[in-house]
């Protein structure tokens, strides 16, 4: 498996993040989602890395060029990211603010925030190598958030209702497999390392459950071998998807889905939905014109093949070498949102 160059290319701009919740609003006419909380990596990060001493940040042009006002907010894309779309789809809010944004309004606290940190992962080595917020440290931020929420709401029962009726959105594992695992292949087999990632996910979910969380939407990894960063590794003539890397991602996703099915029987009152990111994105890659895409192998921006950003990011499945474009998220989000509504009702 040729992970090494992919690992290098993802170092500055990779991703992971957890979940969400809605405040006294109805979705599908049956369930009140109080808030959305997101944890994990750059698929969900809305700006938590901006003030960190890390290269894994994107609060600069051309990032955000299609965002409201053309502003680079620290989101890893050309516009809104996946957590924003889930928040809007669940009728919570249009944009999910970053918890570590110094300008965060206390009025945003009751309807949820994002704790995710681009470049992070379940493995502590992933986060430390990137200089970003490790997922368990994001949970510490959530604990601090609850204290602040108590100060804003000033009603313990209402706070408990917000926490228990929220959706927790989690995206973790992408960077562990793409960045960290290539450095550990002599120490771990694919089977043992993916088992570790699932165990760490299990610990994460149980930690949040102990703090009152009950509704979990957990994302699988992307088809990592089809990221532009993987396609453009040295010697990959034809820029095809790297099947061995996709196979590793698929192994983790299968184990993660099975674990979530098992947790239903272990944690009373909790609900879990596995969010398949792998196959919907792979479908866009394999059938691009059906959704109006032209380029599936390159990023619109920020690659050796595109030193000048493309004029129209909506024609690209990927914005840069590791992150889907806003249009890709918009294309796959509706079915995922319906699945979350159905399974977390």
From Swiss-Prot:
Q: Indicate yes or no for the key word Electron transport.
A: no
> What cystine pairs are annotated?
none
Q: Please provide, alphabetically and separated by semicolons, the GO molecular function terms listed in this UniProt record.
A: lipase activity
Q: Which residues are glycosylated?
A: 103
Transmembrane residue ranges: none
Pfam assignment, any one: Lipase_GDSL
Top-rank taxon of the source lineage equals Eukaryota
Enzyme Commission no: 3.1.1.-
Q: According to its UniProt record, which residues of this chain constitute the active site?
A: 42 (nucleophile), 320, 323
Q: Where in the cell is it found?
A: Secreted
List the signal peptide residues: 1-24
GO CC aspect terms: extracellular region
| GO biological process terms on file | lipid catabolic process
Keywords associated with the record: Glycoprotein, Hydrolase, Lipid degradation, Lipid metabolism, Secreted, Signal
Q: Which InterPro entries match?
A: GDSL (IPR001087), GDSL_lipolytic_enzyme (IPR050592), Lipase_GDSL_AS (IPR008265), SGNH_hydro_sf (IPR036514), SGNH_plant_lipase-like (IPR035669)
Which major enzyme category is it?
A: hydrolase
Q: Does the keyword Repeat apply?
A: no
The entry assigns this protein to a family as follows:
Belongs to the 'GDSL' lipolytic enzyme family.
Q: Which PANTHER family match?
A: GDSL ESTERASE/LIPASE EXL3, GDSL-LIKE LIPASE_ACYLHYDROLASE
Name of the protein: GDSL esterase/lipase At1g23500
**Species of provenance:** Arabidopsis thaliana (Mouse-ear cress)
Biological classification of the source: Eukaryota, Viridiplantae, Streptophyta, Embryophyta, Tracheophyta
């Amino acid at each position: 498996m040729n992970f090494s160059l992919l690992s290098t290319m993802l170092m500055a701009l990779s991703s992971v993040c957890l979940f969400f919740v809605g405040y006294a609003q109805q979705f599908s006419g049956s369930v009140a989602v109080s808030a959305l909380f997101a944890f994990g990596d750059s698929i969900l990060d809305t700006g938590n890395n901006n003030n960190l001493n890390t290269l894994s940040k994107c609060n600069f042009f051309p990032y955000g060029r299609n965002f409201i006002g053309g502003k680079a907010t620290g989101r890893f894309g050309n516009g809104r990211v996946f957590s924003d779309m889930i928040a809007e789809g669940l009728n919570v809010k249009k944009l999910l603010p970053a918890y570590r944004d110094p300008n965060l309004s206390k009025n945003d606290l009751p309807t949820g925030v994002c704790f995710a940190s681009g470049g992070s992962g379940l493995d502590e080595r992933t986060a430390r190598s990137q200089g970003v917020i490790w997922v368990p440290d994001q949970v510490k931020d959530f604990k601090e958030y609850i204290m602040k929420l108590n100060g804003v709401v000033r009603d313990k029962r209402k706070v408990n209702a917000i926490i228990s009726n929220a959706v927790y959105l989690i995206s973790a594992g992408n960077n562990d497999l793409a960045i960290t695992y290539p450095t550990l292949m002599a120490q771990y087999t694919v089977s043992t390392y993916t088992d570790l990632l699932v165990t760490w996910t299990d610990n994460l979910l149980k930690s949040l459950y102990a703090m009152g969380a009950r509704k979990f939407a957990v994302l699988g990894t992307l088809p990592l071998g089809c990221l532009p960063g993987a396609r453009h590794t040295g010697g990959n003539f034809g820029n095809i998807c790297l099947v061995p890397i996709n196979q590793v991602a698929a192994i983790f996703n299968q184990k993660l889905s099975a674990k979530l099915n098992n947790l239903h029987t272990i944690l009373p009152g909790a609900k879990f939905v596995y969010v398949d990111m792998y196959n919907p994105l792979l479908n866009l890659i394999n059938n691009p014109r059906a959704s109006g895409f032209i380029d599936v192998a390159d990023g619109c921006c920020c690659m050796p093949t595109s030193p000048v950003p493309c004029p129209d990011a909506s024609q690209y499945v990927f914005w840069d070498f590791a992150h889907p474009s806003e249009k890709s998220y918009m294309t796959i989000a509706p079915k995922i949102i319906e699945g979350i509504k159905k399974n977390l009702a």
